């Protein structure tokens, strides 16, 4: 039986059909920057169309993902246990969180990809490595374009203030490919010998959480399941669109914008009849990068909300918690009145 973290169980929040913000990247730049900021403020999530990622780059990685996940369990395990990179099945993180999925997790570093390719695609490692690198380069460029638009919309003097973090050669960015088999197949020995107790569409594929990185660039096949939570606690189903990308604000960007952008909480429910495959590029800083609100974001009316921390420190804190726990609270600046109260004791 799959046991998600307590916070990743299906909650009683209402689910509502709401239009997801869609941003056409072919629009005039000043208009684009305003739309990006608005979407990040209101939802922490939006869809981009007319992007620059070539269709063939997407389709080639799709084919590799389908080929890998169609292998039997023993072949997939030969790709290496996810510690953290490699193949994983049901386990999400080190603290007991689980979901109805299997996945490949890769570091974006080309050398790391080359090494992993030898076990993931033994019969064509160079081809696999090239396909993954092409995809990462394309979505990284898309990420930087969006971050520069956000900086312009926030009137940050240096428009590269955010994108340069991702462009750094030591960036800790990741690529993850998730595969959610149909619920009815999860009891099949070719997938996993464990049996599930329910076969309805409320099974957790991936529990409720926010992403710790700066931005997540996501796309999937034509099978739904992804839901995002609004600031008011409503769950919004996200319609799949294999040719386009969805953008999620992560915890690190929430800090960099001093809370003006809020990381989006999301989850994935499994499908009873069709497999879902999704790809996420997690844009992250280098491990030693000091993360704190941009100076433009801190004013007398908007005091600093977070104390500085390195990306390595935040990762360590995140991995010490359960999937659905709120991580940023421990990095918030204490209110002045709290400090005064403590001194008076």
UniProtKB/Swiss-Prot annotation:
Cofactors demanded by this protein: Fe cation
Protein's UniProt keywords contain Cell cycle: no
Pathway entry: Plant hormone biosynthesis; gibberellin biosynthesis
Signal sequence bounds: none
Annotated ranges, domain Fe2OG dioxygenase: 170-285
Origin superkingdom: Eukaryota
PROSITE patterns according to UniProt: FE2OG_OXY (PS51471)
Binding site for Fe cation: 209, 211, 266
Reactions the enzyme catalyzes: gibberellin A1 + 2-oxoglutarate + O2 = gibberellin A8 + succinate + CO2
Molecular-function GO terms, alphabetical: gibberellin 2-beta-dioxygenase activity; metal ion binding
Top-level class of the enzyme under EC nomenclature: oxidoreductase
InterPro entries registered for this protein in UniProt: DIOX_N, IPNS-like_FE2OG_OXY, IPNS-like_sf, Iron_ascorbate_oxido_reductase, Oxoglu/Fe-dep_dioxygenase_dom
Keyword line: Dioxygenase, Iron, Metal-binding, Oxidoreductase
Keyword flag Iron: yes
Tissue specificity comment: Predominantly expressed in leaves.
Catalytic activity, EC: 1.14.11.13
GO annotation terms (biological process): gibberellin biosynthetic process
PANTHER family: 2-OXOGLUTARATE (2OG) AND FE(II)-DEPENDENT OXYGENASE SUPERFAMILY PROTEIN-RELATED
Role this protein plays: Catalyzes the 2-beta-hydroxylation of several biologically active gibberellins, leading to the homeostatic regulation of their endogenous level. Catabolism of gibberellins (GAs) plays a central role in plant development. Converts GA9/GA20 to GA51/GA29 and GA4/GA1 to GA34/GA8.
UniProt similarity note: Belongs to the iron/ascorbate-dependent oxidoreductase family. GA2OX subfamily.
Protein name: Gibberellin 2-beta-dioxygenase 2
Organism the protein comes from: Pisum sativum
């Amino acid at each position: 039986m799959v046991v998600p973290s307590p916070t990743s169980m299906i909650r009683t929040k209402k689910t509502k059909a709401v239009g997801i913000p869609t941003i056409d990247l072919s629009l005039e730049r000043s208009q684009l920057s305003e739309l990006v900021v608005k979407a990040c403020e209101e939802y922490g999530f939006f869809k981009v169309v007319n992007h620059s990622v070539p269709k063939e780059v997407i389709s080639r990685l799709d084919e590799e993902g389908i080929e890998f996940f169609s292998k039997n369990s023993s072949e997939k395990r030969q790709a290496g246990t996810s510690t953290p990179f490699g193949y994983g099945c049901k386990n999400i993180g080190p603290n007991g969180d689980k979901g109805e999925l299997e996945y490949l997790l890769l570091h974006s570093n080309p050398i790391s990809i080359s090494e992993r390719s030898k076990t993931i695609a033994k019969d064509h490692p160079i081809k696999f490595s090239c396909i993954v690198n092409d995809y990462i380069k394309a979505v990284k460029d898309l990420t930087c374009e969006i971050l520069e638009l956000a900086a312009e919309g926030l009137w940050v003097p240096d428009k590269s203030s955010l994108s340069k973090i991702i462009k750094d050669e030591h960036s800790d960015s990741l690529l993850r490919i998730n595969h959610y088999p149909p619920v009815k197949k999860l009891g099949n020995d070719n997938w996993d010998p464990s049996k599930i107790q329910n076969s309805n569409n409320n099974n957790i594929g991936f529990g409720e959480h926010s992403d710790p990185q700066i931005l997540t660039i996501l796309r999937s096949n034509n099978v739904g399941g992804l839901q995002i939570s609004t600031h008011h606690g409503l769950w919004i189903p996200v319609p799949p669109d294999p040719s386009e990308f969805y953008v999620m604000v992560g915890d690190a960007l929430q800090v960099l914008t001093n809370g003006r952008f809020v990381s989006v909480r999301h989850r994935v429910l499994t499908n009873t009849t069709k497999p879902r495959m999704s790809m996420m590029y997690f844009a992250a800083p280098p491990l030693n990068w000091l993360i704190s609100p941009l100076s433009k974001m801190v004013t007398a009316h908007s005091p600093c909300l977070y104390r500085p921390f390195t990306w390595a420190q935040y990762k360590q804190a995140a991995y010490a918690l359960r999937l659905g726990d709120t991580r940023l609270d421990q990095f918030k600046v204490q209110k002045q009145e709290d400090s005064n109260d403590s001194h008076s004791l």
